[in-house]
A protein has these predicted regions:
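Conserved GHKL (Bergerat-fold) ATPase module
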Residues: 1-360
Length: 360
């Protein structure tokens, strides 16, 4: 808190007239400029800057959102968690210094926690390239990052949106491979889209997935799963229609063409197997869970998973039981034979006496 004393302001009982004074506008601009200069000086001392950001970091981000005139200066002072920053935050300048050769974008992702966001399947391709990703764990972080647009010459994009596609970084050979996969799985993607209906906007072959079978990504102007949850909670608190507000927020489903599960689905579709529809829905629901979305039909999801697990168990159990029974029978036979042999040996070794003859 502070106070500004000025002899240039006219004395007036009307606060409305005073607020329109040009002198007040000049004072306001100078205060902002002097404050920014002070913040920049604090940023030169690492320990002081940590203390400053822990106390006022959120307000710096609010300034990034609301103060367009000073947005660039404030953005250089804002700190965000990242996949490479450990427990400390990072500034955009520090991020830029760590960017990999050939990296053309600055990436960020939102999540309920840093660990949850960092484990999202949409980051697999970026991790493989060694790219650092900023992590927004608070609504203020996400709103601030959404409004950045560009930092210097780099576009700032949400890694969980289609705008983060790395098509501009692919070689000619990689582009050709992508087109071949798209044609090869054309029938499969069309089938999955029909099976899911309005739950997804599009079903596409992914270049960003390396180990997961599927993932959900938002279109360029879509809301992240965390922002959707936040908006639903706000609508519910205000007594509004949360489902109406979130209508039309379907995501795109991306499939990994090299994953065994997707290859199995392709085979099921090609053979016209009835299991293909349930398999498609499971891939979608797995993508929803791993990408941070809520499964709209938890009971159905559980039922499909149990059905899949149960089908495998029924085939495996008789075989295992039969093997166990066979092993038990073999052990019993071996024990009986051993006991008989031992009894025979004992009988043979026993001397022949009148008593033995009487027993016989």
């Amino acid at each position: 808190q502070g106070m500004v004393d000025s002899e240039d302001l006219p004395l007036n009982v009307s606060r409305e007239l005073l607020q329109k004074s040009k002198v007040l506008s000049i004072i306001s601009k100078r205060l902002v400029r002097k404050s920014l200069d002070m913040f920049k000086e604090i940023a030169k001392d690492e320990e002081k800057f940590k203390t400053f950001t822990s106390n006022f970091g959120r307000y710096i981000k609010v300034g990034v959102i609301e103060d367009q005139d000073n947005k660039e200066a404030l953005l250089k002072l804002a700190t965000f968690a990242s996949t490479d920053s450990g427990d400390e935050g990072t500034t955009f300048d520090a991020y830029k210094e760590r960017m990999k050769e050939g990296q053309k974008k600055i990436y960020y992702i939102s999540g309920a926690s840093k660990a949850a966001a960092a484990s999202s399947p949409v980051l697999e391709g970026l991790k493989k390239k060694g790219y650092e990703v900023l992590v927004a764990v608070d609504q203020i972080d996400e709103i601030a990052l959404q409004g950045v647009g560009t930092f210097e010459e780099f576009a700032v994009v949400d890694a969980a949106k289609e705008s983060a596609d790395d098509a501009d970084e692919l070689s000619e050979e990689e582009k050709a491979t992508k087109e071949d996969a798209k044609k090869e799985f054309e029938k499969t993607t069309a089938f999955v889209k029909e099976a899911l209906g309005n739950q997804v906007d599009r079903v596409e072959i992914s270049t960003r997935l390396t180990s997961s079978p599927s993932a959900l990504v938002q279109p360029q102007w879509g809301m992240s799963p965390q922002m959707q949850k936040f908006m639903k909670a706000q609508a519910a608190a205000a007594g509004g229609d949360e489902m109406g507000m979130m209508g039309g927020m379907s995501a795109n489903l991306e499939l990994n063409p090299t994953h065994p599960a997707v290859l199995k689905l392709k085979g099921l579709v090609a053979s016209g197997d009835d299991e293909a529809k349930d398999f498609s829905i499971i891939l979608y629901e797995v993508a929803a869970v791993s990408s941070g979305y809520e499964v709209t039909d938890p009971a159905g999801f559980a039922s499909r998973i149990v059905k899949l697990m149960g089908g495998e168990a029924v085939k495996a159990k008789p075989t295992a039981a039969k093997a166990d029974d066979k092993a038990d029978d073999k052990a019993d036979d071996k024990a009986d034979d051993k006991a008989d042999d031992k009894a025979d040996d004992k009988a043979d070794d026993k001397p022949i006496t009148p008593e033995v003859m009487e027993e016989n």
